[in-house]
Regions:
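C-terminal structured "cap/appendage" subdomains that terminate the fold
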Residues: 247-257
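Short loop/turn segments immediately following the C-termini of beta-strands
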Residues: 22, 71-72, 119, 163, ...
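Repetitive beta-architecture junctions, highlighting loop-to-beta-strand starts
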Residues: 24, 75, 112, 120, ...
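Short loop/turn segments that connect beta-strands within beta-propeller blades
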Residues: 30-34, 41, 81-84, 126-130, ...
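Hydrophobic alpha-helical hairpins/lids featuring a short glycine-rich hinge
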Residues: 2-40
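Extracytoplasmic beta-rich repeat domains
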Residues: 1-11, 39-61, 73-74, 90-111, ...
Length: 257
């Protein structure tokens, strides 16, 4: 990676600020004084691996825990004490690098899950002990060939609603809807859509429909609307460039790149 400094949004918890560098170095900073309270070379310590553009994950605070995706052969995700930086648990390895997306934390029928994306899998972690409850091979679901290097560039945070999780990735990759059952301990593929492949700009869900821009090339993409329940493309509006989307006050705002 050629981006050693922080590439993520900082996470604020009270008067503490938590950040990760592009190399996976974590730090807790006093928000009042600006001094570093603790730091951890997380990727180096836990033999993490990541893509050519470095670490871009925004950190999640959950009670006393801070979650970070290392990737690599030793573990996939770790939980550390937010006050000290000491390890609480680490998951098994999925033998793939970290992606560029940020995880989500969800409560489903009394179960608490951390869900994130790797270049090969979407996976769910039991936050009480770090066990990986399920993993969905999105490459296989979309009929893509894995190059064995985990080189897929995936940036979009998964979207959670009711009992379903939407994964999407650009570069002609596509989208996978994942259905959770058994208190979130089991997962299966509900539908796939190879035309809705969101690059960087994220997605929003409004009244049962997903909105975002697909990827044609790095400079072009179309605005799309997809049915949340079926994956059907409702419309695709030709445009000059892909971009970001947000919903507020009954309006969908599209911001092209």
């Amino acid at each position: 990676a050629s981006h050693p400094e922080s590439r993520c949004s900082p996470t604020v918890d009270g008067d503490k600020i938590y950040v990760s560098s592009g190399f996976g170095d974590l730090a807790c900073i006093d928000g009042n004084a600006g001094n570093i309270l603790w730091s951890l070379k997380a990727s180096e310590t836990y033999k993490g691996t990541y893509g050519s553009w470095g670490i871009a994950e925004s950190l999640i605070i959950d009670g006393e825990k801070l979650y970070f995706t290392t990737g690599g052969l030793e573990t996939m995700t770790i939980a550390i004490n937010k006050k000290t930086g000491e390890l609480i648990w680490k998951t098994e390895s999925l033998n793939v690098p970290a992606s560029y997306s940020s995880p989500i934390l969800l409560n489903y029928e009394g179960y608490r899950l951390l869900v994130n994306v790797s270049p090969v899998y979407v996976y769910g972690v039991d936050v009480t002990n770090g066990s990986i409850l399920w993993k969905i091979n999105h490459m296989e679901a979309l009929g893509k060939e894995d190059d064995g290097k985990g080189s897929q560039i995936l940036c979009v945070t998964p979207l959670w609603h009711n009992n379903k999780i939407l994964f999407t990735g650009g570069y002609n990759h596509g989208s996978v809807m994942i259905d959770l059952t058994d208190n979130g301990k089991k997962a299966s593929v509900a539908w796939t859509n190879t035309d809705f492949d969101v690059h960087h700009g994220g997605v929003v869900l409004v009244d049962g429909y997903i909105y975002g821009s697909n990827w044609i090339n790095n400079g072009n993409g179309n605005w799309c609307c997809v049915d949340w329940n079926t994956g059907k493309m409702m419309w695709e509006e030709q445009w000059k460039c892909k971009g970001s989307v947000i919903f507020a006050d009954g309006m969908i705002y599209l911001y092209e790149e």
